[in-house]
Amino acid sequence: MKKRLLVAEDEHDLLVIYRMMLGDAYEVIEAQNGREAVEMWNQFHPDLVLMDIQMPVMSGDAAIREILGVDPLAKILAVTAYRYSAEQLGVPVLNKGFGPSEFVAAVESMLHGHAAGSNHPAAC
């Protein structure tokens, strides 16, 4: 059974690129803002959320707080072009500018219970 990923990203081109990098290995659900991400998370309970931070309607950091407020064990990887720390967001961070192998490795690492990204909180 494929792992289910929720990809929250407001830039359509990046959604297409992420889908290409992930290939057919995962079931991918998309959200284009933080509010949609929370709704999709509540509906589908994905194995991992890949969350952009700067999005319309509701920011990714607000969506992260809302999801973790319901399920503190939810697996979320912040994917951002901005310099946020894992301590600020409460989840591991993968800074945009990564290559396909780094992206897939971060996803696999998170799915297997390890912190991923360029910096991560000690709790992960």
Where are these regions (language model features)?
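Conserved phosphotransfer cores of two-component systems
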Residues: N42-F44, E66-A74, R83-S85
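Acidic catalytic/metal-coordinating carboxylates
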Residues: N33-E36, S59-A62
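Two-component/phosphorelay signaling modules centered on CheY-like receiver
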Residues: H12-I29
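Receiver (REC) domain active-site loop signature in two-component systems and cognate sites
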Residues: M55
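Active-site residues of response regulator receiver
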Residues: D52
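C-terminal output helix
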Residues: F98-H120
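Conserved acidic carboxylate
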Residues: E9
